[in-house]
């Protein structure tokens, strides 16, 4: 690769924006860019072409010039191409008739009848050579006709005299023969009449029986059909209704059983709850009775007053007993009704059983009864269903009410139980409290008891008298009782208060007994009056207490009596209900078991019935199928029988006819028949099972072309090769009528073609299903070991193989197989070997010595009378030429060598198989291609097909099956009705005891509280009676299906009688024919007409006049169309007009002037609206054509010149020739394409030519759109898209326009690295022959480059890099025509200045091929601005943003320089390898303390996914170099750490350098941030230190001299809060832990320089 340098002005292309915004560019087309294409053409054009049109944004074409999509073809072009190669009309060819005219005239004068036949049409030929041949044939025939007419005329005169004498002799002999014949004929007529009458009677009897049979058959079939349809309909309705009823009953039963189960479970729960209640009640009762004993002692007197309660109890008891009797009566009535229902059901079932018996007896009329009962059944079923629905609704309503009542009772009982249990618990707790209180009271009352007993004795003595007086007090008792209750409450409270006071008083009393003694005397005096009052009240109390106790005793006795009766009745009811339930449960269980048995038995019955029905229906279906088949077979049998008889008769007649003609031309010498039918199999499927490759047409032609069968080593052989290969190409194209597979026949290796799906063929009475054709190439004269062949999908079209004027022999082995895959014996088959030509071909290439042969190996050859093909011992072929009469042939080839020719036997021979396999060898010599068709269509005349040998067998009629008698299913037992259980009696209610009268309080005594009375047992509501389901009505009895009468099998149709044959009539006597009078002979003659349709050919050439048909050329290439016409023949009419019209394809730029120059002899006109050019022969040209009409004349042709102007376009074209307005012909279609057609169905991977560009980093990673650091190298990879040009046929003028690739790079952002440029091909091989030149601007480029870019409509924005193919032809031959893409890698370095300003830059490229430009995609990148900052801080906290830049720092104050590095944005193009902080501080004012820290300024991510948060201490990943002598510190991040940062992550760090101010003055400081080799300066900070106000004490200065030591990586100490890591020693001798190093020598190596203020 050569390199050139050019310098000049540059123009800015950079946008200084960190986001990399793309600047829009307006494309301006200069006036200079509008130049006409005539600059590149040898002649001027009619219209200029703008080759600088902008990129086709709408079409998607990246072309910079001529981007337009090819427009649709004109309607004229489409119509012309749709009629390609079609012809209309013709030109007549005249032949002289003088000799024939004279012979006709002479015959008429001699008395011979002369008749002129219709003029014979000799057809229409296509070439003047063929016209000359036909004219010669016509002349010869005219001479032959003239000679025949002369001979006929002379013979006629001699025959007339001899005819009369012979006629007289024959008449006498014929009269005797006629008399005998008439006698025999009368006898025969009588016999014929007798036999005819007999046969007529037999036929009438047969037809009568046949008519009766068909009538009866139709009636039986209709009856069976009606019966079956009615039965099926009724049965279907019954089964649907039965299924519905059974499902409804099953659902109802399931719901009922669920309700029963739920009720049972609920009752069990209630029963368990009641049992628990009874247990608790029993316990409560025991407790109660114990308490009651004590209570009864105390209430004996009160019970006497309760006698009135007895009357109330008796009334209630009477009512209870009446209700109990009513319930028991109702239960008895329900039970009776249930038993009656069961009995009625049983009786009903018995009735149904009896009715079923009667029904079975009446089945003779079953069908009518069945239908009537079925209707009644459906009505009854509807009633039952309605009743069941009503029962269900009633049941559901009762069930709902029952469940609601049950829920209410259970809730009430639960509440009562809860209240009762709470009362018991409260009572127990209260009694325990009272018991405890009573114990205390007893202790306190021990002393008082003695006093009380003494007083009681006196009280009882006085009580008797008091009780008598208290009778009057009863009336006001109740009023007093109310007051008593109120007073009692007050007293109880007072007593409680008194007790508390008393307790205290007791304690006080024990201390003050002495004082109390005096007080007691006074108390006793006061108590005397109280005692009198008390005793009076006590007497009344005792009287009232006795009355209450008496009444309560009566109540208790009444309650106990009622309770005993209740418990007795409850036990009875519960036992009765339990017994009823057990009986019901057992009945249900028995019912379920019984119904299970019935259901199982019914299931078995249904199964047996279903099996019987299925078997019957299967047999019936089989019978009906067999009957249908029988009827069909019988009809088929009759047809076959008739066909057999007709075929036998026709066969015998045909053999007899062949016998008559066995010596005639076209017939076989002995009668033969054909047992082989193999005429057409259009739907056959062809497979090449030998594994040989099947080619498409292009592959096939390419492979044959590569084999080079005819070497083009001489001019003669070149033309011979062209003709042979054109013939080959035409013979291998796809055709809807002749589909096939293209294979090569290798020498010595069989190629097996297997045909399946054969439908129309037979062999020896067996159907042919498949066949195998095995071809083996034995020998070939070609210089190759294989030859091409077309094997057609229809095996009767067979094979078309190509010889290329050589000779070959091919063994053919054919096997036929039946439908079971068995091979069929071919013995006896007649094989057709026809169209065996000899003496045809191209004289200049094979000397008309072509010969076609067959060597038949598996049978005998039978020669056809008169055929030119004979068995010559070494094969079957024509011993002499049979192509033209001029070469000894009896017929012309076009007379016999067609499928429908009546004399096609002339080139045929027949082979008769004597063995099971078919084998023969095909061979030919000196032919271009041979079509061989193997079929059974024998060319010998009237060969009949051999009929089947045996008479067809009549079918056997099937036997109809009998319908089975189905078993009847049993009805299920009805479900027992659940009994109505007796409700439990209502327990008696205890009459509450009367309260005891208030006993007067003993004075000063605390009375024991009585026990709380036991709570009264709650009155439980009786459980409601669950609803009783109304039993479902039983399903109505299904009527039994009638036992149908079994149909009698049909009588077989009467067989047509064998009629007596008529007697053979007497043979007509053979009269000796009297000689006809000598007829006046008629001589016939005819004239001929001949026409010609001269052919036309359209050729397409490039600028080098090379054929480019069906190839591609570059856009803007010159394409020339040649409109060729064949020679015009002798005998043609005068040519008065000769016009050629060519509708040009769209996108083709026609050059009128150049076309006129290339088309002398024609007037040329152009219609721009239709893009059509017309050529009209000039008068001079017409004169040359008409100069001598008796001789063949050659024509001249015009040439169209123009350019193709579209990418990815297809240009197809043909033209029309019109001669004398009588003959017209459309030419062939030629085609040329331009590269880059998208969505081309023949080349689906095509696309527009599009150069491609990507930006990669040094590791080959694509970095398009990513941030690129200054100093980085961009490795731009450019693709030169050349694969679309593969197979290009452009001319040299297009190639010489050159091949270029332009890189339009932004020179403001990038510096070229031409030393690193690489160019490779798709295999990675280095490309040579390309020069690369750098131009500073378009103006700096040479004129040739500027002109080339202007024509391609490409304007670089500034500097550009141009790659140029040094030798366009060599470059074209090496890469373009082979379609090899090239890859250019051109590295460029981002300028350092870009890092300081930041901004985006854009880059794109162009390729220019053949003068056509194509634009690549743009590549855009951003350069981040690196802007380091410097602050002065007093703290180490990264979150503290306080900056004291510009402020005052005290002398000896410690502070920090904060160095903030530039931010590296996310998604940067390459790894970081350098990131450092270089601080050149003023050591005269600042002293480094030896301590620094590095922190993350932003969150960033490592390659392993670790996230480092902002503020993280990064000191351990750094190293420091210190030069205190010169005031220099360099802190650098380790390279391995930097490279571990993900390129998808941002990165920024900051460093704190701790300083101490050691001098007075103003000090400035700036640091340098280095990123990947590029340095960036920070801002400058300034701080001032004033003179201290108070001088410091003088100190003895201590100077420490540091010696430089080797660099040491920083190892941080554990951080301390608020302090930097110390790097000095304990005496602050300024020795940092990391090791301070004096690096004077080291910095000099690094090139560091100190900055002074």
Swiss-Prot record:
Positions of the UniProt region annotated as Disordered: 56-93, 107-137, 975-1073
Which terms are listed as keywords in the entry?
Cell wall, Peptidoglycan-anchor, Repeat, Secreted, Signal
Q: Which InterPro entries match?
A: Adh_isopep-form_adh_dom, AgI/II_N, Antigen_C, Cross-wall-target_lipo_motif, Glucan-bd_C/Surface_Ag-I/II_V, LPXTG_anchor, SA_I/II_PAC_V_sf, Surface_Ag_I_II_A_rpt
Proregion positions: 1624-1653
> Where does the record place the modification Pentaglycyl murein peptidoglycan amidated threonine?
1623
Q: Does the keyword Transcription apply?
A: no
Alphabetized Pfam families for the sequence = Adhesin_P1_N, AgI_II_C2, Antigen_C, GbpC, Gram_pos_anchor, Strep_SA_rep
Q: Which residue intervals are annotated with compositional bias (Pro residues) in the record?
A: 982-995, 1012-1034
The name under which this protein is listed is Probable cell-surface antigen I/II
Q: What are the start and end residues of each P repeat?
A: 960-998, 999-1037, 1038-1066
Q: What is the originating organism of this protein?
A: Streptococcus criceti
For the region Heptad repeats of Y-[EQ]-X-X-L-A-X, give the residue spans: 206-616
Task: Indicate the family of this protein.
Answer: Belongs to the antigen I/II family.
Report motif location: LPXTG sorting signal: 1620-1624
Membrane topology (UniProt) = Peptidoglycan-anchor
This protein's source sits in the domain of life called: Bacteria
Can you say where the Ag I/II A repeats lie in this chain?
150-224, 225-306, 307-388, 389-470, 471-552, 553-634
Q: Where is the composition biased (Low complexity)?
A: 72-86
User: What is one cellular component GO term in this UniProt entry?
Assistant: extracellular region
Q: Which NCBIfam families match?
A: isopep_sspB_C2 (TIGR04228), LPXTG_anchor (TIGR01167), Streccoc_I_II (NF033804), strep_RK_lipo (TIGR03726)
Stretch list, region V-region (lectin-like): 629-951
**TM helices/strands, residue ranges:** none
Which SUPFAM superfamilies does the protein's record reference? V-region of surface antigen I/II (SA I/II, PAC) (SSF74914)
Q: Does the keyword Secreted apply?
A: yes
Compositional bias of type Basic and acidic residues: which residue ranges? 996-1011
Annotated Gene3D superfamilies: 2.60.40.740, 6.10.250.2200, Major cell-surface adhesin PAc
How far does the signal peptide extend, from start to end residue?
Answer: 1-38
């Amino acid at each position: 690769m050569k390199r050139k340098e050019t310098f000049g002005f540059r123009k800015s292309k950079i946008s200084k924006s960190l986001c990399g915004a793309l600047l829009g560019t307006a494309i301006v087309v200069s006036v200079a860019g509008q130049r006409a294409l005539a600059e590149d053409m040898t002649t001027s054009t009619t219209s200029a072409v703008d080759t600088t049109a902008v990129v086709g944004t709408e079409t998607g074409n990246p072309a910079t010039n001529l981007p337009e999509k090819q427009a649709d073809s004109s309607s004229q072009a489409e119509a012309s191409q749709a009629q390609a190669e079609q012809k209309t009309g013709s030109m007549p060819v005249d032949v002289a008739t003088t000799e024939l005219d004279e012979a006709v005239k002479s015959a008429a004068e001699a008395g011979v009848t002369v008749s002129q036949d219709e003029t014979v049409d000799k057809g229409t030929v296509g070439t003047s050579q063929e016209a000359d041949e036909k004219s010669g044939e016509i002349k010869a025939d005219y001479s032959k006709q003239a000679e025949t007419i002369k001979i006929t005329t002379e013979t006629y005169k001699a025959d007339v005299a001899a005819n009369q004498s012979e006629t007289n002799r024959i008449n006498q002999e014929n009269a005797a023969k006629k008399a005998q014949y008439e006698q025999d004929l009368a006898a025969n007529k009588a016999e014929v009449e007798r036999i005819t009458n007999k046969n007529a009677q037999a036929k009438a009897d047969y037809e009568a029986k046949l008519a009766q049979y068909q009538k009866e058959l139709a009636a039986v079939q209709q009856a069976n059909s009606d019966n079956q349809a009615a039965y099926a309909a009724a049965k279907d309705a019954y089964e649907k209704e039965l299924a519905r009823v059974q499902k409804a009953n099953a659902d109802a039963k399931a719901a009922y059983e669920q309700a029963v189960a739920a009720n049972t479970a609920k009752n069990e729960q209630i029963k368990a709850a009641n049992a628990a209640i009874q247990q608790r009640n029993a316990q409560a009762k025991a407790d109660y009775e114990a308490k009651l004993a004590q209570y009864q002692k105390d209430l004996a007197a009160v019970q006497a007053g309760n006698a009135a309660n007895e009357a109330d109890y008796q009334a209630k008891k009477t009512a209870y007993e009446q209700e109990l009797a009513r319930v028991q009566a109702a239960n008895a009535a329900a039970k009776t009704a249930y038993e009656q229902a069961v009995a009625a059901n049983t009786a009903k079932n018995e009735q149904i059983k009896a009715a079923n018996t009667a029904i079975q007896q009446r089945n003779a009329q079953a069908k009518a009864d069945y239908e009537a009962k079925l209707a009644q059944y459906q009505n009854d079923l509807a009633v039952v269903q309605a009743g069941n629905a009503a029962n269900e609704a009633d049941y559901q309503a009762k069930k709902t009410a029952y469940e609601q009542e049950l829920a209410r009772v259970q809730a009430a009982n639960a509440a009562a139980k809860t209240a009762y249990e709470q009362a018991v618990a409260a009572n127990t707790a209260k009694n325990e409290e009272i018991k405890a209180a009573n114990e205390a009271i007893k202790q306190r009352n021990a002393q008082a008891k003695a006093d009380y007993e003494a007083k009681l004795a006196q009280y009882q003595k006085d009580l008797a008298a008091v009780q008598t007086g208290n009778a009057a007090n009863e009336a006001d008792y109740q009023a007093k009782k109310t007051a008593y209750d109120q007073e009692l409450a007050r007293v109880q409270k007072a007593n409680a208060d008194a007790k508390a006071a008393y307790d205290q008083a007791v304690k006080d009393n024990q201390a003050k007994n002495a004082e109390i003694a005096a007080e007691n005397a006074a108390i006793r005096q006061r108590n005397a009056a109280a005692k009198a009052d008390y005793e009076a009240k006590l007497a009344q109390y005792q009287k009232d207490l006795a009355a209450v106790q008496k009444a309560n005793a009566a109540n208790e006795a009444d309650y106990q009596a009622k309770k005993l009766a209740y418990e007795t009745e409850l036990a009875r009811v519960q036992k009765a209900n339990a017994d009823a339930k057990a009986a019901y449960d057992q009945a249900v269980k028995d019912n379920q078991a019984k119904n299970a048995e019935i259901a199982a038995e019914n299931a078995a019955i249904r199964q047996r019935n279903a099996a019987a029905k299925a078997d019957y229906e299967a047999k019936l279906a089989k019978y009906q199928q067999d009957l249908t088949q029988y009827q069909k077979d019988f009809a088929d049998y009759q047809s076959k029988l008739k066909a057999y008889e007709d075929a036998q008769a026709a066969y015998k007649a045909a053999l007899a006819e062949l016998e008559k003609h066995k010596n005639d031309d076209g017939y076989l010498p002995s009668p033969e028949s054909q047992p082989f039918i193999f005429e057409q199999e259009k739907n056959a499927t062809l497979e090449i099972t030998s594994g040989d490759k099947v080619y498409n047409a292009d592959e096939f032609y390419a492979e044959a072309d590569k084999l080079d069968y005819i070497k083009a080593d001489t001019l003669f052989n070149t033309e011979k090769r062209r003709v042979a290969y054109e013939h080959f190409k035409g013979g291998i194209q796809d055709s809807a009528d002749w589909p096939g597979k293209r294979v090569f026949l290798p020498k010595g290796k069989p190629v097996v073609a297997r045909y399946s799906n054969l439908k129309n063929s037979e062999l020896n009475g067996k159907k042919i299903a498949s066949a195998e054709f095995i071809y083996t190439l034995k020998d070939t004269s070609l210089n190759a070991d294989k030859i091409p062949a077309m094997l057609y999908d229809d095996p009767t079209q067979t094979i078309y193989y190509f010889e290329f004027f050589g000779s070959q022999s091919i063994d053919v082995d054919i096997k036929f197989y039946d439908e079971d895959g068995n091979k069929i014996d071919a013995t006896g088959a007649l094989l057709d070997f026809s169209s065996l030509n000899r003496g045809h071909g191209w004289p200049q290439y094979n000397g008309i010595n072509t010969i076609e042969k067959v060597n038949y190996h598996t049978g005998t050859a039978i020669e056809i009378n008169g055929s030119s093909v004979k068995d010559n011992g070494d094969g079957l072929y024509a011993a002499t030429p049979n192509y033209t009469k001029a070469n000894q042939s009896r017929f012309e080839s076009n007379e016999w060598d067609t499928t429908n020719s009546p004399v096609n036997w002339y080139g045929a021979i027949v082979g008769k198989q004597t063995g099971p396999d078919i084998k023969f060898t095909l061979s030919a010599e000196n032919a271009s291609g041979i079509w061989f068709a193997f079929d059974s269509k024998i060319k010998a005349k009237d060969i009949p097909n051999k009929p089947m040998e045996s008479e067809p067998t009549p079918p056997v009629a099937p036997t109809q099956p009998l319908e089975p008698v189905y078993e009847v299913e049993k009805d299920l037992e009805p479900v027992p009705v659940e009994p109505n259980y007796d409700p439990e009696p209502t327990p008696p209610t205890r009459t509450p005891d009367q309260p005891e009268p208030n006993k007067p309080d003993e004075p000063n005594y605390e009375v024991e509280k009585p026990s709380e009375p036991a709570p009264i047992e709650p009155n439980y509501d009786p459980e409601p009676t669950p609803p009783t389901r109304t039993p479902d009505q039983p399903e109505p009895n299904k009527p039994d299906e009638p036992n149908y009468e079994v149909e009698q099998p049909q009588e077989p149709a009467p067989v047509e009688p064998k009629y007596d044959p008529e007697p053979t009539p007497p043979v007509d006597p053979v009269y000796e024919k009297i000689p006809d009078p000598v007829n006046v002979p008629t001589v016939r003659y005819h004239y001929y007409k001949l026409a010609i349709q001269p052919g036309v050919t359209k050729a397409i050439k490039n600028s080098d006049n090379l054929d480019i048909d069906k190839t591609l050329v570059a856009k803007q290439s010159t394409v020339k169309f040649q409109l060729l016409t064949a020679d015009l023949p002798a005998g043609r009419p005068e040519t008065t007009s000769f016009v050629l019209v060519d509708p040009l394809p769209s996108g083709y730029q026609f050059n009128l002037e150049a076309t006129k120059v290339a088309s002398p002899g024609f007037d040329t006109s152009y219609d721009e609206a239709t893009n059509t050019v017309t050529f009209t022969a000039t008068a001079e040209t017409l004169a040359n054509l008409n100069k001598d009409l008796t001789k063949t004349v050659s024509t001249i042709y015009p040439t169209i010149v123009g350019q193709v102007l579209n990418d990815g376009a297809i240009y197809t074209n043909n033209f029309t020739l019109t001669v004398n307005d009588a003959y017209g012909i459309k030419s062939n279609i030629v085609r040329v394409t331009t590269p880059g057609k998208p969505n081309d169905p023949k080349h689906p991977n095509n696309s527009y030519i599009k150069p491609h560009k990507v930006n990669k980093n040094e590791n080959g990673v694509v970095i398009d759109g990513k941030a690129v650091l200054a100093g980085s190298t961009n490795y731009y990879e450019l693709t030169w898209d050349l694969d679309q040009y593969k197979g290009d046929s452009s001319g040299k003028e297009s190639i010489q326009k050159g091949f270029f690739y332009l890189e339009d790079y932004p020179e403001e952002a990038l510096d070229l690295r031409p030393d690193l440029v690489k160019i490779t091909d798709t295999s990675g091989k280095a490309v040579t022959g390309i020069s690369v030149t750098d131009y500073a601007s378009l103006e700096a480029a040479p004129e040739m480059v500027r002109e080339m870019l202007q024509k391609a409509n490409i304007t670089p924005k500034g500097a550009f890099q141009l790659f140029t193919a040094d030798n366009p032809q060599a470059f074209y031959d090496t890469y373009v025509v082979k379609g090899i893409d090239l890859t250019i890698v051109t590295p460029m370095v981002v300028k350092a200045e870009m890092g300081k300003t930041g901004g985006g830059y854009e880059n794109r490229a162009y390729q220019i091929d053949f003068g056509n430009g194509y634009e690549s995609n743009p590549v855009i990148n951003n350069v981040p601005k690196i802007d380091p900052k410097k602050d002065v801080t007093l703290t180490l906290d990264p979150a503290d943003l306080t900056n004291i830049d510009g402020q005052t720092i005290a002398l000896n104050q410690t502070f920090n320089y904060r160095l903030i590095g530039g931010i590296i944005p996310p998604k940067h193009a390459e790894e970081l390898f350098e990131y450092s902080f270089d601080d050149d501080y003023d050591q005269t004012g600042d002293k480094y303390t030896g301590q620094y820290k590095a922190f993350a300024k932003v969150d960033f991510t490592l390659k392993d996914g670790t996230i480092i948060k902002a503020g993280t201490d990064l000191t351990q990943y750094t190293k420091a170099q210190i030069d205190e002598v010169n005031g220099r510190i360099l802190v650098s991040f380790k390279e391995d750490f930097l490279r571990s940062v993900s390129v998808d992550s941002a990165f920024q760090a900051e460093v704190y350098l701790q300083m101490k101010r050691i001098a007075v003055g103003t000090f400035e400081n700036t640091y340098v941030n280095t990123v990947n080799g590029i340095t960036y300066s920070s801002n400058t900070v300034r701080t001032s230190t004033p003179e201290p106000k108070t001088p410091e004490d003088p100190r003895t200065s201590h100077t420490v001299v540091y010696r430089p030591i080797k660099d040491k990586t920083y190892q941080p100490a554990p951080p301390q809060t608020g302090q930097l890591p110390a790097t000095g020693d304990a005496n602050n001798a300024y020795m940092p832990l990391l090791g301070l190093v004096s690096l004077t020598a080291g910095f000099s190596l690094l090139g560091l320089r100190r900055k002074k203020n």
